[in-house]
């Protein structure tokens, strides 16, 4: 199985992987932060014109400039499914409940054969306990699994309190498979501003 990499970003490169004998391809992830940021950015530009009167040429932004990339991602899943005969596995990266069920369904509707839920979370809030984080992730798996019919694989971090117990909870919540482990990113600290950098 070809894991997520730049090779899945173009159909011709993915086709070469298939011709070389891979049995499935995992898409790069659609990130929660990306969806939130781009949605807020779109709202910002749609609600503010560069001129203050409606007759101005640039009163409303050019709609083509603000295409939300989740749509591009879904189109890419559909394009890979048309170009390849091997399974295409979509990937969502996020930790909060809510819109994920919609995006999971949309990735399934675009033709993905399975979905990888990549749950990488950097705890920066001292008021959130390890138990809170694990509960949040188990709830997210249950919510996403209830929204789709395709298999759900869950990619986890090695930094949980008890890997056997946590993975058992994920399977009980609906995970059909587990991916061990996520690539580790560490937050950095801005010592001048005394802020955590993500």
Predicted region positions:
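Alpha/beta enzyme core
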Residues: 2-59, 68-198
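The substrate-binding groove and active-site-proximal loops of carbohydrate-active enzymes
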Residues: 63
């Amino acid at each position: 199985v070809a894991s997520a990499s730049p090779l899945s970003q173009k159909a011709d490169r993915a086709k070469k992987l298939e011709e070389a004998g891979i049995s499935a391809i995992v898409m790069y992830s659609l990130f929660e932060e990306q969806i939130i940021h781009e949605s807020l950015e779109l709202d910002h530009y749609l609600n503010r014109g560069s001129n203050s009167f409606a007759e101005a040429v640039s009163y409303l932004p050019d709609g083509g400039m603000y295409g939300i990339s989740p749509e591009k991602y879904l189109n890419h899943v559909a394009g890979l499914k048309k170009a390849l005969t091997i399974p295409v596995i979509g990937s969502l990266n996020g930790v909060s409940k809510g819109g994920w069920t919609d995006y999971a369904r949309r990735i399934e509707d675009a033709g993905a054969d399975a979905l990888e839920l990549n749950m990488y979370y950097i705890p920066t809030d001292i008021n959130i306990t390890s138990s809170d984080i694990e509960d949040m992730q188990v709830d997210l798996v249950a919510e996403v699994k209830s929204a789709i019919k395709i298999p759900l694989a869950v990619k986890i971090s090695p930094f949980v309190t008890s890997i056997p117990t946590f993975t058992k909870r994920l399977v009980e919540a609906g995970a059909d498979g587990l991916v061990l482990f996520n690539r580790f990113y560490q937050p950095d600290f801005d010592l001048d501003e005394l802020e955590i950098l993500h």
